[in-house]
Amino acid sequence: MGDDLMRTRHGFMITAAVCTVMFMSTACTGPGEIDPSAVADVTPTPGTSEEAMPTDGAAEAADKVSAIMVQPIHDAQVVFGSDEMNHVEYELLVVNVFSDPVTLTGVTIIGADGEELGKVEGDTLAAATQSLYTHAPSPVVDASAAVSVDIDLALPTGDVPERVTHRIDYTLPDVPGAVIVDDHVVHGPEVAVDTGEAIVIAPPVAGDGWLTTSACCSPNVHRDLRLSANGLRIETAETFAVDWALVKGDRVYDGDGSSNEQFYDFGAEVLAVADGTVVAVNDGVEESIPFTSKPPETKQGFGGNQVILEIAPGVFAAYAHLQPGSITVGVGDDVEVGDVLAKLGNTGPSQGPHLHFGLLDKPDLFTGRSLPFVHEAFTVVGTVDFAALTGDELVIAPESRELTEAYPLYGVIVNFPDQ
């Protein structure tokens, strides 16, 4: 099992986009340490007594009071994207330990030799700074609150850095308590980069005109999903997961979209992306009516009807929102790449028919960690501007680029070759 899996490595402009959510996805379903040697020198605050400050050179080694604490949620992951850039993906957990709101003003990513690799600021920083669950972008961190800064560091093909560090700038309001804060800069944290090779898989659907309505790497409901696992860690189960919808012309459905049958992808065959074994199946969830998704009554219902395959040790392929009664496999069945597993549907919390697909390090849509992958080959035929979406018609910039061993980024339309 998994012998046919291939792996590849490509070598690494900072990118992000204002979070725009396509109607398809409502909720589709290591911390590091701050390096104390890297912090800036203490400058005594005017009005502070000499007795309270270190003397005789001890100030250089003293800890300093900061209004925030910053840690990485995980090591960084790398994927070669359809823009032909290497995307380094990770999240910085920022906790406000001050009595008033703190405003983040800049996150600079720094390489091992001190070179600046990228900087997140302004509107880009605002879009990338998300509350931990509610997907509310803002650079302001409320008192005693925590946010995640989602980093998408896109670098040209070349060597992938094994580690990066940061300079994080922030401001405080003019309040009396601010005098205890020694510096408005955090130097760090350091983040390890997982330079392992991305898994190469076949596509989960076939044919032309497939649009990624949610995917890595700019802000969207997949990239921004975070859940607590066992109360001990934050997991990112959908960073690289893709929601696939079929486009014809500039639309994803015919008519007014009031029925599932009007969607071009409804009933499309869902395919095994590699040889593997079925480890989980959920069926019996009824189809939703487009644009009227309701929260499920059970945890299992969040993915609607599902199939999960183990395609390699510690690598699980998850398919969700499948048509009821269409699943052709059962737990324990062995499958080969290209086998039909089910039909594309609209079950679970979904605003319209689509396929949710992703790789995980365990067979759990909530506490598994999303794994990067690339498809063997596809052609990018357009990119959708979701920010310009005002009605049923998509705003598409046409293009034609053939790619091998690449990941389809958020908003691209691709054609898959015949298998």
Regions found by a protein language model. Name each.
Residues 194-206, 211-213, 221-225, 297-301, ...:
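Acidic, glycine-rich catalytic/binding loops that coordinate metals and/or anionic ligands
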Residues 154-199:
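Terminal connector regions
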Residues 24-27:
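C-terminal motif of bacterial Sec signal peptides marking the signal peptidase cleavage site
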Residues 94-98:
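Asparagine-centered strand-capping/turn motif at beta-strand->loop junctions
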Residues 271, 311, 315-338:
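Short histidine-centered loop motifs in beta-beta connectors
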Residues 29-32:
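Bacterial signal peptide processing site
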Residues 118-160:
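Intrinsically disordered, low-complexity Pro/Gly/Ser/Thr-rich segments with frequent PxxP/GP/PP motifs
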Residues 264, 277-323:
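Zn2+-dependent peptidoglycan hydrolase active-site motif and core
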